């Protein structure tokens, strides 16, 4: 499926001033917090995962990959790899409670046309959708410190492999696609000194 190109975020030469500066400030704060971590949707077993990065302006980019090297054919003796490189933008988050914000996907773009195929070096590459984000109608952001026992069990089921025994609060931010019941857990963002320092502090505590 093809995605529509998103409308430009700003107009050239025009300063766009929001009437609701409080909402903008809170939105920026949420995205700034989300941007401290990278996010993973994976089962903990198998070769598939979706990696996601959120930026301070609410935009995001990521990739999904899965490998089935046992599925071969005459033209692809080395198996099949499913891929999706994508980018997009979240809408302005709406506060639900102290640790939860609700949002939607405002736009989504794919690097390659979904369902397209290429064969390279004996491997068939099939371009798929963004597993974990596809079909999303409502997405929840969970802030660091959120009580785990108050989160949806469907979300906790996905993130449980990343939790320590006895852990009662999230030590990172998380993302939950309610529609597809897909949960992303947070991790140290590569190149982020702030999140690295935070992770080191948590290890010491």
Model-derived features: where do they sit?
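Sec-dependent signal peptide cleavage junction
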Residues: 1-12
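Tryptophan-anchored aromatic micro-motifs
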Residues: 20-51, 61, 176-190, 194, ...
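N-terminal glycine/threonine-rich, aromatic-flanked beta-hairpin/loop signature
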Residues: 46-116
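Short, solvent-exposed secondary-structure boundary motifs
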Residues: 37-46, 79-83, 130-131
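Beta-strand-rich cores of mature extracytoplasmic or soluble domains
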Residues: 109-204
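Hydrophobic beta-strand residues in large extracellular and virion-surface proteins
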Residues: 37-39, 52-54, 60, 90, ...
